[in-house]
Amino acid sequence: MNMKGQETRGFQSEVKQLLHLMIHSLYSNKEIFLRELISNASDAADKLRFRALSNPELFEGDGELRVRLSFDKEKRTLTLSDNGIGMTRDEVIDNLGTIAKSGTKAFLESIGSDQAKDSQLIGQFGVGFYSAFIVADKVTVRTRAAGAPADTGVFWESAGEGDYTIADITKDERGTEITLHLREGEDEYLDDWRLRSVISKYSDHIALPVEIQVKNEEDGTVTWEKINKAQALWTRGKAEISDDEYKAFYKHIAHDFTDPLSWSHNRVEGKQEYTSLLYIPAQAPWDMWNRDHKHGLKLYVQRVFIMDEAEQFMPNYLRFVRGLIDSNDLPLNVSREILQDSRITQNLRSALTKRVLQMLEKLAKDDAEKYQQFWQQFGMALKEGPAEDGSNKETIAKLLRFASTHTDSSAQTVSLEDYVSRMAEGQEKIYYITADSYAAAKSSPHLELFRKKGIEVLLLSDRIDEWMMSYLTEFEGKAFQSVSKADDSLNKLADEENPEQQEAEKALEPFVERVKTLLGERVKDVRLTHRLTDTPAIVTTDADEMSTQMAKLFAAAGQQAPEVKYIFELNPDHGLVKRAAEVTDDTQFAQWVELLLDQALLAERGTLEDPNQFIRRMNQLLTA
């Protein structure tokens, strides 16, 4: 082979690390290398079809796209070739020598020593071409970009260690040819029956014909036999597609090793004509929280592939959904910019969003255990829904799950429908509390009255919860009420109109005024409360005041938040409050009041501005 411009280059450090991890973590599932390479060939064919829409000459007189497999037992090689889009020298360096995915370094650092878990994570990452090194100790690539001269072919070769060789060659046929020099012990991939079996398992559903070389034993002639159905799965009728085929197609488009939790395949005719195939994965992708990474569906127009990760068809809170849409109404030359402003896109987005929410409703109704698995993986994303998608807020609310005082468990298993069904007679509101952790929410003094009255409270401890609740105002006509807010309805619950209590409060009015004078502008108000049973004091905020958790959310985002002004509420029946009320010495009185306020602030915020002063004050009072 005549090679020019030959050079040896080092792999990007992340590639070396991924190759090492992959070879060791994925060996038990090594046959997926064939799925990955055929999937890449299918993508190359899709890209050529799309580009040829505006430049038919790229087909170079050969529009019959396919991928071919052949093997040589003597040389111990397996060769896979396609006549798709091919690559230039720069593209080979970018695609085979580096990983362009954002967040790659952080992803690789997250890989540990758990081999089973690592294999799932690496599978999610999308191993693609590099999977060849699971079974090969050397890989050779010959490629030429469609429409480019024959002498612009590229040779690439590597043993999957620290470097690779690249050179310019002459290649008459467009497309890519990958030759795997198999490791010792990998003879099964030199067997015709074994190759057919793997291809049928993983690649029956793709539209690209997969052909295997057949040699005539008598005269040595070579023919090619198609061994997959080569019909786009979503174009077939649902009745003729097996669950295994749906699962295999999911793994093809999502590059996932695990089966999906659920899927929905629909063909819509009428004002708009389209086919959608949507999947709910079983586990969250490694980059779901990476803001730089695009998430979206594969877009086809009249069965022609247009683009990957078309995010315009799904709201951000459903970014975990995988699948495709095949539209008959969009133009073949559609771009991301056109999609953004298209009424057709908006209508499709609305319809697909409703389809996914219906799928989740059905899953929650039919299989609570599977839905709980979904919630553990994607619940945090779904909690973004009420703020992002007001038109579907009620449906999303039904899908939310919470921890609750009813279950005495940190597991988020309680639905709002569950809560409403258990509401006490006469109860008009859905009570909840937000805190930094489940333990802090569960032990909050704000719950004392509700435990006493046997009223269930939802325990919210995810960072997003306070923000979510600012958009969730009611459910089935029942208003949401934070138990950490100062509210008249909570006073009624506490029977604060009891004549005996009113008499006791009157006697403590001078004490309350004394506390107000001492604290001044540091608090919004000082009040007596009967919401507490075991705690001497709490702080609350007015209904229109920013809550503690919302202020923390602003701070975490680096935004300036207004200072939270608390209402200081004292329990007149508690021994410490009674003791403080009896103190006549101003200095000692100030110590008691400051201690009670610090206790209340610590319970509410989890921190104090000056914890050392709090400790000194407490020690002084303990030894007084």
UniProtKB/Swiss-Prot annotation:
Q: Which UniProt keywords apply?
A: ATP-binding, Chaperone, Cytoplasm, Nucleotide-binding, Stress response
Spell out the CDD domains in the cross-references: HATPase_Hsp90-like (cd16927)
Does the record bear Chaperone in its keywords?
yes
Identify the stretch annotated as signal peptide in this record.
none
Q: Where is this region: B?
A: 337-552
GO MF, one annotated term: unfolded protein binding
As for subcellular location, the record says:
Cytoplasm
The record ties this protein, via InterPro entries, to: HATPase_C_sf, Heat_shock_protein_90_CS, HSP90_C, Hsp90_fam, Hsp90_N, Ribosomal_Su5_D2-typ_SF
Q: Cellular component terms, GO, for this chain's entry?
A: cytoplasm
Q: Where is this region: C?
A: 553-624
Which Pfam families does the UniProt record give?
HATPase_c_3, HSP90
Chain intervals for the UniProt region annotation (A): 1-336
Q: Which PANTHER family match?
A: HEAT SHOCK PROTEIN 90 FAMILY MEMBER
- State the similarity comment: Belongs to the heat shock protein 90 family.
Q: How does it assemble?
A: Homodimer.
**Cross-referenced HAMAP family:** HSP90
Task performed by this protein: Molecular chaperone. Has ATPase activity.
NCBIfam families of this UniProt entry? PRK05218.1
Q: What is the name listed in the Swiss-Prot or TrEMBL entry for this protein?
A: Chaperone protein HtpG
Organism encoding this protein: Yersinia pestis (strain Pestoides F)
